Amino acid sequence: MERSFPSFRTAFAECLTGEADGYVLELPGWAGESLERLEETTVAVFDWYGARSTPRRPAVSREDVTDPSHWFHWGEHRAFVLCFAPCFREDHARYGFGRPETFVMFQHERAFHRRHPQQIPVGVRRAVRRTFDEAGRGYEYDIGAVPTYD
């Protein structure tokens, strides 16, 4: 994680100028080999970055990373977080398409606001859900960074 920190900081700064939409942290597959391990990993990632935030962020819990309304906070930034890991089957919305790695994707709130300043239109939401359904992976909008089931 130490090696990723400079690129994490840079990506979040670039989100403010529109040069980036977020950051993807690639971790070894074992970090997401089971749902329980993925929860532990995500809590550890949030805590590690949070400890390096100004202001310093309080520790998070498993309940935080499974809460669909939870946003990751770092400094003045907020990001919606999704995890893709080997523990998810092909029909799951968080399936990693056969990649052996675990990915933690931080989508900065500015990425949403640039495209849809008020809120994401209903038509866009429907199109996203339809695309997921057509791919056999029903879109699940009520899951947190880590879903509560695999």
Q: What kind of feature is each model-predicted range?
A:
Residues 1-66:
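Long acidic/polar interaction regions in large eukaryotic complex-forming proteins
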Residues 23, 49, 95, 139-141, ...:
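Sequence-level detector for tyrosine residue identity
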Residues 32, 88-91, 113:
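Eukaryotic short linear interaction motifs
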Residues 60-106:
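Aromatic/basic-lined ligand-recognition segments
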Residues 38-40, 87, 94-96, 117-121:
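Surface-exposed beta-strand edges and their flanking turn/coil or helix-capping segments
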Residues 15-19, 88, 135-142:
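Short secondary-structure junctions and interdomain/linker hinges
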Residues 27-30, 84-86, 109:
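An acidic- and aromatic-residue-enriched active-site/binding cleft used to recognize and process polar
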Residues 100-150:
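Polybasic, proline/glycine-rich intrinsically disordered low-complexity segments
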